[in-house]
């Protein structure tokens, strides 16, 4: 009887611990996306007035490297990184003047890696998400407004 009680109590406790681990990894992933967006937007703001296209490339490369080198990052998840630059959050921009404010939006896929919990969180997530085979990704976004130097 004690063994059955242990199993009945142990399974939910195991699932709770796994959920806490996965949520901690998601929190770390979101923090890495926020950091990548901040660093990318700073690099973009410095170069955008002289060469807008090159500034976007430099900012994307910075975001790509930060997302790839984050804990749990990989080339696979970094490949799901996009960087959008807009004037008002909606319309695309293709040039920038000094003092102009632009919106830099970074989107990055963070993989759900904890077994059993990955499917559950993937189903519950209301945001953008992608499933590739047996891998589940939540698309984390971070937005920064920058003033072109």
Segments and roles (model prediction):
Residues 45-149:
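Short, conserved structural patches
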Residues 1-65:
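Alpha-helical assembly-interface signal, strongest on the long, hydrophobic N-terminal helix that forms
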């Amino acid at each position: 009887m004690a063994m059955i009680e242990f199993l009945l109590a142990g399974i939910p406790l195991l699932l709770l611990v796994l959920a806490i681990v996965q949520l901690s990894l998601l929190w770390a992933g979101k923090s890495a996306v926020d950091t990548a967006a901040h660093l990318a937007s700073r690099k973009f703001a410095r170069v955008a007035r002289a060469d807008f296209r090159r500034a976007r490339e430099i900012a994307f490369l910075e975001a790509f490297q930060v997302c790839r080198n984050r804990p749990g990052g990989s080339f696979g998840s970094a490949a799901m990184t996009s960087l959008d630059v807009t004037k008002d959050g909606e319309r695309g921009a293709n040039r920038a003047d000094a003092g102009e404010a632009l919106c830099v939006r970074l989107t990055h896929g963070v993989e759900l890696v904890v077994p059993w919990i990955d499917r559950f969180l993937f189903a519950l997530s209301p945001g953008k998400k992608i499933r590739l085979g047996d891998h589940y990704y939540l698309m984390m976004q971070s937005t920064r407004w920058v003033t072109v130097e």
